[in-house]
Each structure stands twice: as structure tokens, then as C-alpha cells.
Amino acid sequence: MRGLVCAICLSLLCSSVAFAAPKKETPKKGNPNDQAVLDFDAPFVDDSNTKADGDITDWGNYKLTEFSTLMSGEYDYDWTGPKDLSGAVSVMYGAEKIYFYIKVKDNAVVSKKKRWKSDKVELWLMPEDENGKALGGLRGLQLDLGPMVDGGAISAKWLSGKQSGATAVGFIGDGGYDIEVSVNYDALGKTPVMNGAMRYCVLVRDWDQDDANEDEAAIGSCPINPKNPKSIKREKMGKVSLNLKDAMWQYILDVDKRHSLAPDKRLSAAKEPWQIEVTDIGGTPTPDLVAFSGDTLVIAGYGLGNDQLAWFSLSLESPGSGAPAKIDILDINGDKKPEIRITRDEHCTNNPMTANRSYLFRFENNATHYLASYINEIRMDNGDGVMKNTYTFTKQATIQKLDPKSSKEMGGCQLNGSSDMFEFLMPSDGEKSRTLPHI
């Protein structure tokens, strides 16, 4: 009987002990701030030989940069690993377009026709200049995989603004899909191609469609918020550095070296550093280069004569003093045609004096045309005196004036190649101004 009582007590004791169930872990959610910014020093390519056509052999020599950080959705539920969803991107740029290759691993590429929503990729872009100033607003290009899943072509659509300036081609393969995209700079604002940058971000939106309660999983190449991608700050976007200015000039030097007969006549043999200005001479979408060194002027650009890079060189008859010249691009007479002004010092051949001389050129009808030259001032090399002239250019005439403070004791200055130069007004001439023909 005693044993029975003890057994009953033990049974009651055991029934009163409760074991706590293990706490269910909350799935980790995607966080845009976990993603690093991916920058590129993109290679330059020839637009005439590069197209968004689905032929990815163009990208064979260029590295893809991978990204797989979850921006939205839950790990282990909406995203199970890189094979479920991960991405990679590469960038090239040409004179008129920028190119993106986007490669996505996705174990289920879906269309909204099947059930809920299509898989999509968004490419967000904003150009900026060399000082980091925006050259246009933020634009998003939506690439819808749905039509491609259903047997058609990928749909490329700007999320705002005009629907032009972008081309996309994609194909679905084993374990994912590939997309080639080309975007014209003029679809984004002013071109940054010479020495600026393209800010970019790739956002990949994924739906597996195996659960009605699933959330969208999204990954990105920058810390972008999938719920409000337009809120991305420019400094948080990836930066593609562009430098067509240097690429153009190096190409010109390389070609000139191969074709120049005399080594000392090559552009690369210039004794003085090349001064290079970026400007618009030919009125084409891509800016041009104006370069000067010693006595040689070079004008280069795409669309100057044909669609390829072309350049034109011209040598002055007189040598400079060795001091750096100044390049100005201006419309001197208001006719809306840009002139090129080269200003430099030249030594007088008859007296120990130095003249500051300007040369005017215009590029027109696929040729560089010399317009005129004139002396701005003449200085005694010992600093004892100076004479100055000023010039005002209008559509009707050129007005030349003598600075009243000019030294009266100085003699004239003879320069090489001065036969077609405006005659300098001397204090001894007795004239204070002259009216000359217009340029």
C-alpha cells in the first residue's frame, strides 16, 4: 500500500512539470544598407561595332562584378541562396552610348500571365560631370522578363519621361537569364562622356510564385530601397568613370605614330605639353577636342566629316616663345558659329621685345579655316614699356583701339608670318582707333 501511494505521488509530481517549447526564430529580412556600392572604371568601345543584340561575346574580356545582398524579402523563405537569386553586372561606354551586361541567376524565371507578377530588372541612371555636379535627373529603365518568358522579347520601358534612347535584348538560359542594355547619353541629360561619370544601380525583382503568401525578393548593386527606388541618393549609387577625352587623344597619338614618316613630326614628339579643351565645334551629340602645342593646332571629334573619330591639324608659320598658350572657344561676332582663339607670346625678330598674339580659326565644312591674327600687346623684355590694342568684333566690323596708356618711346615689332596680321596701332601713328572688315 505504501508503495502504491509513493507511485501515485510520483505520478502527480511528473504531471506538474512543463517543458518550454523552443522559441521560433524570426526570419532575417533583407536590408538595402547591407549592400556595398559597386564602382567601375569602364573600358571604351567603338559604338559602330557595339550593339545590344544578345551576343555576349562582346563582354568576354570584361569582368562581371557580382551582387547578392537581399534588399527585400526574407532569407530562407523568399531567398534560399545565390542559385535562387543573385546578379552580376559589367559596363562599357562609347562616344554616344553606355552599355550594361546584367547576368542573373534565378531558379524560376516567371511571368505574370502564369500567376501573380513578372520578374523584373530596373536600371537606375544619372549622369554627372567631373566635379560631381548632376547633368540630368534620375531615370529608371524597367526591364520586364514576363514577355520573354511567354515567348516574346524583353520589355524595356522608362518609368518616366520620353520612351526613347534605350535598347535591351535578353535571353533565358539554364539557371537564369542575361540582358544587354544600351542607353544613349542624350536620353539622360547632358553627356558626361568626356571626363565625367555615370551613376547607376541595378535592382532585380524576383517572384518564385510557389506560395501565395511569398514576398518579393530583391537584390541590388547599391543600397537601393525596392519600395521607393527613386529615393536613392546619387552618392549611394555606383559610379562608372568615363574618360573619352583621354581615350580619344591617345587613339589619335597612336594612329599618328603609325602613319607619320618622320619621328620628329609626330604629335607625340611635341616639345611643349599639349593643352586640350573639350568643346562643341561640329554640332554633334558628342563633344569635340581642341588641342594646341608649340605651333600645331588639332581639332578632333566624332561626326567631323563622318561617324568615326576624325581629326584635323594645322601648323602656324611662326614659333612661340615656349610659354603656354591659351585656348578660347567663343562666338566673337554673334553669328552663333564658334571660333577658336589661340593666344600666345612670340618674340619680336627686330627688337628685344615680346608680343602677345591671337589667332582666330573656324571649323566649317570639314576643314579648319584661318580667319585672322592680331597683336594684343607688345612688351619690352626689360620691363621698361608696354603698348596695347583692344579689339571688338561685331557682325558688321572689327573695331581696333589703342590703349591711351601705351608707351610712346617704343619701336615696332616684327613677327614671322605676319603678312596677313592686323597692323598694330602705334602711339606714333596718330590714330586712336580703326574700323576693319568683320571676321
Where are these regions (language model features)?
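Terminal domain-start segments
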Residues: 244-319, 425-439
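Acidic, small-residue rich beta-repeat scaffolds with periodic aromatic anchors
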Residues: 22-29, 244-267, 348-439
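Repeated scaffold domains used in trafficking and secretory/extracellular systems
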Residues: 273-276, 321-329, 380-388
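Acidic/hydrophobic-patterned starts of short beta strands in beta-sheet-rich repeat architectures
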Residues: 280-293, 332-346, 392-406
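Hydrophobic residues embedded in beta-strands of well-ordered beta-sheets
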Residues: 98, 121, 152-154, 175-179, ...
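Positively charged n-region of N-terminal signal peptides that target proteins for export
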Residues: 1-5
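Structural preference for beta-rich elements and adjacent junctions enriched in aromatics
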Residues: 21-261
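Bacterial N-terminal signal peptides
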Residues: 7-15
